[in-house]
């Protein structure tokens, strides 16, 4: 599951600068921790570049993983499976998570 990409089903209303609308998300939670929720990071094709927003390719389109907006979502919000990060992308997301949480 970790590193998998899913289409997110619509959830509660967003506020402020939170992402809204249809989008994909990357599962970033450890496979060793099974809960009714899953920690994900949404993606965006229009977000500004930042060292904590690694780029990945999804269906031939470059998109950014918004590690700065990672959150727990109920497993029922996971829609269709959309792919899996490759080893390089997984490493870049891991680095961004460590940077965002200050655990480098």
Tell me the role of every PLM-derived stretch.
Residues 1-104:
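Conserved functional hotspots at enzyme active or ligand-binding sites that engage polyanionic ligands
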